[in-house]
Amino acid sequence: LNLLVNVLGKSPKELFSEFEEDYELEGASTGDVKYHLGFSSNIITPNGEVHVSLNNNPSHLEIVNPVIEGSVRARQERLKDKNKDLVIPILIHGDAAFSGKGVVMETLQMSQTRGYGVGGSIHVIENNQIGFTTSDPRDSRSTLYSTDVAKMIECPILHVNGDDPEMVVFAAKLACEYRYTFKKDIIIDM
């Protein structure tokens, strides 16, 4: 909800009206929770206007990742973006789902292939150590970090304290610079 209002600019009135009992979606409805609905807007930055999309995110954890990658690839091709600089996927994960859902590994494995590559994705992991089926973080995985599974594609992993906003911004800028330079995935574990 925070991302929808404070980053994408969705009005709080519009957001909260979706929670009213008599609110009806336009088009077909999946019956999923309202805050999983997508949204897109244009954001004004110091370097100009940027179009930002938050894809519909069904309750099936992480299943949206290959959909986003495909959407980005299609947009890159439509824009004739051979350098893959104009459309960039940013994927947000929970730590338990990142290391526990096979679709994450499948998406990572496709990341550098000619047919599916998008020039690298920026992965942001909210490492809150909350998995729906694990009450003790020691039971959530066999590795020290949830990001260890990404070592299979040898992408950099930046571990940053989410309580240090300046370091989070530094990590985000570094991730963007890496992605633009090397056209490969990078992970911010926060």
Identify the meaning behind each predicted range.
Residues 104-107, 143, 172:
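Amphipathic alpha-helical segments in well-structured domains
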Residues 1-90, 96-137, 153, 157:
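Conserved internal helical-beta-strand scaffold that buttresses enzyme catalytic cores
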Residues 113, 149, 178:
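Hydrophobic/aromatic ligand-binding patch that stacks against planar heteroaromatic rings
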Residues 167-190:
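Structural signature of the thiamine diphosphate
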Residues 138-142:
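A short beta-strand-to-alpha-helix junction
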